[in-house]
Curated annotation (Swiss-Prot):
SUPFAM superfamilies in the record: ENTH/VHS domain (SSF48464)
Chain ranges of the ENTH domain: 12-144
Native organism: Rattus norvegicus (Rat)
Region spans: 3 X 3 AA repeats of N-P-F: 501-573
Database matches in PROSITE patterns: ENTH, UIM
Ranges annotated as biased composition (Low complexity): 157-167, 306-316, 333-346, 367-379
Originating gene: Epn1
Protein name, entry field: Epsin-1
Amino acid sequence: MSTSSLRRQMKNIVHNYSEAEIKVREATSNDPWGPSSSLMSEIADLTYNVVAFSEIMSMIWKRLNDHGKNWRHVYKAMTLMEYLIKTGSERVSQQCKENMYAVQTLKDFQYVDRDGKDQGVNVREKAKQLVALLRDEDRLREERAHALKTKEKLAQTATASSAAVGSGPPPEAEQAWPQSSGEEELQLQLALAMSKEEADQPPSCGPEDDVQLQLALSLSREEHDKEERIRRGDDLRLQMAIEESKRETGGKEESSLMDLADVFTTPAPPQASDPWGGPASVPTAVPVAAAASDPWGAPAVPPAADPWGGAAPTPASGDPWRPAAPTGPSVDPWGGTPAPAAGEGPTSDPWGSADGGAPVSGPPSSDPWAPAPAFSDPWGGSPAKPSSNGTAVGGFDTEPDEFSDFDRLRTALPTSGSSTGELELLAGEVPARSPGAFDMSGVGGSLAESVGSPPPAATPTPTPPTRKTPESFLGPNAALVDLDSLVSRPGPTPPGAKASNPFLPSGAPATGPSVTNPFQPAPPATLTLNQLRLSPVPPVPGAPPTYISPLGGGPGLPPMMPPGPPAPNTNPFLL
């Protein structure tokens, strides 16, 4: 006896199982072989007993609930149930139909042993066959009738063989039980044949399967409709997004084209802005038939007023490279004095050439940036000067000269500069009118030129400054002095020449210097010790004092030559 058999017997005694329950436990054991046909036949005969029937069915349902490693309990329980449905009481098939859901759950039975073999496939196939048999009433009836006939044939064969042996008929239980191994083998072959026939027959779908199929189809249809609606919504949103993107792209392209068109259109003429704060010009309407504006041409608006007070220039022509038309004389604040007009007298230039009587068509005014001429006179002396006296200067009438009788005593001034390059410091023209004592216009002009600062702005009616010459310093009595003899070395007097100096004493010789000079200053007084101490520069003994007297208020003469030995004294007024 095996260990499993001993264990089952111990459990049967402990749990106090009945005879029917013990047979069911034996038929559905965990042994590796199947239940015997004789044991199943005995259990089928016990199903006709009401008490035994309940015990048998409760034990079968308990075995069907096992799982995992007890997969043989489940498989053998379904095999016994199938045999009882075909050969047992009709109450077995009825109770199985009522509890069909327990058999349907076994369609998903899963178990894989240690060797990796799927043992649950046997349980799943057996559950499908049993469910198909319970749902098909006609097949169940045919299978039941065929099993009962086979059972009767087996019983009759067993009865005939037993009658030959014994006189009395065997009991009913003995007829069902196989009497020999050959009969048991025959029953097993019959059961296998019936199982094959059932497996070959196609499973028929019951009403529940149809309902489930319809339900599954409806669910699938609803899912499909839902997915279709979602897909259509996505397509619609995608189409709307594409259209919106196309509209935005079209708008951007249109704006880009408009910007490009604006670039090539004619821009409005800009308003001229004066950097010196001049008034802005009023723009005028451009006529339709006007020509296109030249980008290199003159501005369309009139030029603003000159902030320096100059005359307004005439509008330039449209071509900026065409030479400008001759216009009126422009006032140059840094240039010389412009030439007078034809109807006006020549204006006296205090630092220019003394050519008052020159015609209007004389040489132009000196350019401050042009190279200096060969002859340079810091006091404005001209190389050629007219010797006329009493003429009108600058268009003003002269007063009658009361010393005109002394004109015969004057000598003609040299017509050209000295050949030795001496500066004609006292050369000049005697003006007809002496300047006022408080006239400082010449001093201002001289200071402006000496410092180098720009002259003030031109006044509406400037007073023409008069030139400061030795004649203007001496006044009307300038004709009484021979200026040439004062600044030049006296030459030899020709014999027989008549003396023209009215200040010489009578009876004095015509040649030779005078004995006494009325213009010689008195000798300097001797300074005391306190005066010498307070004096910043002590006087040099034997040297005459230096007197600086500016002529006409002009600046002192700068040194024109490097210092050297002092020139010999040629002043006739000094001893």
